[in-house]
Amino acid sequence: MGKITFYEDRGFQGRCYECSSDCPNLQTYFSRCNSIRVDSGCWMLYERPNYQGYQYFLRRGDYPDYQQWMGFSDSIRSCRSIPYTSSHRIRLYERDDYRGLVSELMDDCSCIHDRFRLHEIYSMHVLEGCWVLYEMPNYRGRQYLLRPGDYRRYHDWGAMDAKVGSLRRVMDLY
């Protein structure tokens, strides 16, 4: 398992909370989060309790303020440790319910449009490993954690539309 430390103030100051497992509600430990240190593992942070709201993917490293993890505010209310796997495989479909097979990926894709000439993906099947989906190319914009399993519609991964810009494998390379 990984280890992550949340700090109420920027620059690793103020009250802190150390975490080494999934936590559906961080509100009892701190009221705001302005800096984070990830000592080990990869983590997905959520702006609301019970793994809801905006998602932020973090790897090992220091994040002295919330802009460093592309945060919109100092609200972090739940977190998940992402298990590491050595192999990754995902199937992308251009329509919902696994219709219109686009391709199978085993590596990162910085621009879905350049590779497949599509701006939208309506369903996915994650066969191996965990992935982070980004709504914009080059790993920017809203982020969504994809664990192994079925995603019949974009709502299943938490998105409000089918816009997909890039996909990245979750790998702790540091």
UniProtKB/Swiss-Prot annotation:
InterPro entries: Beta/Gamma-Crystallin (IPR050252), Beta/gamma_crystallin (IPR001064), G_crystallin-like (IPR011024). Signal peptide: none annotated. SMART domains: XTALbg. GO terms for biological process: eye development; lens development in camera-type eye. It holds the Pfam family Crystall. Residues 2-40, 41-83, 88-128, 129-171 form the Beta/gamma crystallin 'Greek key' domain. One of its GO terms (molecular function) is structural constituent of eye lens. Keywords: Eye lens protein, Repeat. Residues 84-87 are annotated as: Connecting peptide. Disulfide bonds: none annotated. There are six different gamma crystallins identified in mouse lens. Crystallins are the dominant structural components of the vertebrate eye lens. Has a two-domain beta-structure, folded into four very similar Greek key motifs. PANTHER family: BETA/GAMMA CRYSTALLIN, GAMMA-CRYSTALLIN A. Belongs to the beta/gamma-crystallin family. This is Gamma-crystallin A. The lineage of its organism: Eukaryota, Metazoa, Chordata, Craniata, Vertebrata. The gene is Cryga.
